[in-house]
């Protein structure tokens, strides 16, 4: 979870003809499957696409991420560039120590929506409570489950020969024989 503070600003009230000072607003945010699902239901397009989001779409996603109750709508208009950078860094953070070293990285052109991720969760028996996790952590868990569920990779002839050679050498040394 990320907590940001939207700073106070001074506004002019034309009706009363006076300046008023707004209060700082604390927002607790969570980049999760739940927030992505809310955003996609409003905008009718995939959140996880390569397309850039408009400022309106970005601010609305921040609304979808918000866990803080009763936030006045005007607070979202006061979000600073510093707040946006902090949120962007939080969204991009892996939130896990797990890394992948897949040499045969293929580009998947499948459009990923929240429903596709929910399908993956069901197919892999991942509990629905994980929908509230940071999205990158959930996607890492899905990737780990996919890797662990794959059958063991078959060795080619060269790998088998090298393995047998090292096993034979270890046996010769353990039994003090020449072969």
Language model feature labels by segment:
Residues 1-43, 47, 67-154:
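An amphipathic, hydrophobic-aromatic interaction surface with interspersed Lys/Arg
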Residues 56-68:
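Short, hydrophobic/proline-enriched secondary-structure or compact coil segments at domain edges
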Residues 142-179:
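Alpha-helical oligomerization segments
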């Amino acid at each position: 979870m990320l907590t940001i503070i939207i700073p106070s600003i001074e506004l002019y009230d034309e009706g009363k003809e006076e300046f008023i000072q707004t209060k700082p607003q604390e927002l607790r945010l969570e980049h999760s499957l739940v927030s992505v699902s809310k955003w996609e239901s409003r905008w009718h397009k995939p959140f996880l696409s390569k397309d850039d989001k408009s400022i309106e779409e970005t601010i609305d996603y921040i609304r979808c991420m918000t866990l803080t109750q009763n936030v006045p709508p005007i607070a979202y208009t006061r979000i600073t560039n510093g707040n946006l950078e902090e949120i962007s860094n939080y969204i991009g953070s892996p939130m896990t120590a797990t890394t992948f070293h897949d040499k045969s990285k293929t580009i998947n052109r499948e459009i990923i929506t929240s429903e596709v991720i929910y399908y993956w969760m069901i197919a892999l028996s991942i509990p629905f409570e994980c929908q509230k996790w940071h999205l990158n952590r959930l996607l890492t868990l899905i990737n780990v489950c996919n890797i662990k569920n794959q059958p063991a990779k078959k060795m080619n002839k060269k790998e088998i020969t090298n393995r047998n050679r090292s096993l034979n050498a270890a046996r010769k040394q353990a039994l003090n024989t020449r072969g």
